[in-house]
């Protein structure tokens, strides 16, 4: 139903946000070094 679609979208968004945060952290570290 609708709720499972919303939950799935939230999970995907969280995954994308985590990936973006990890990339940003790596960039910050490589620039700091």
Swiss-Prot record:
UniProtKB keywords: Amidation, Amphibian defense peptide, Antibiotic, Antimicrobial, Secreted
Q: Name one GO cellular component term.
A: extracellular region
Where does tissue-level expression of this protein occur?
Answer: Expressed by the skin glands.
Q: Indicate the principal place this protein occupies in or around the cell.
A: secreted
Protein's UniProt keywords contain Secreted? yes
Q: Which residues carry this modification: Valine amide?
A: 33
One short Pfam family name for this protein?
A: DD_K
GO biological process terms, alphabetically, are: defense response to bacterium
Instruction: Please indicate if the UniProt record lists Metal-binding as a keyword.
Output: no
**Compartments (UniProt record):** Secreted
Family that this chain belongs to? Belongs to the frog skin active peptide (FSAP) family. Dermaseptin subfamily.
What's this chain's function?
A: Has antibacterial activity against the Gram-positive bacteria S.aureus and E.faecalis, and the Gram-negative bacteria P.aeruginosa and E.coli. Has antiprotozoal activity against T.cruzi. Has antifungal activity against the yeasts C.tropicalis (MIC=10.1 uM), C.guilliermondii (MIC=20.3 uM), C.albicans (MIC=20.3 uM) and C.albicans ATCC 1023 (MIC=10.1 uM). Decreases viability of murine peritoneal cells. Fuses to, and disrupts liposomes.
Can you name this protein? Dermaseptin-DI1
Native source organism of the sequence: Phyllomedusa distincta
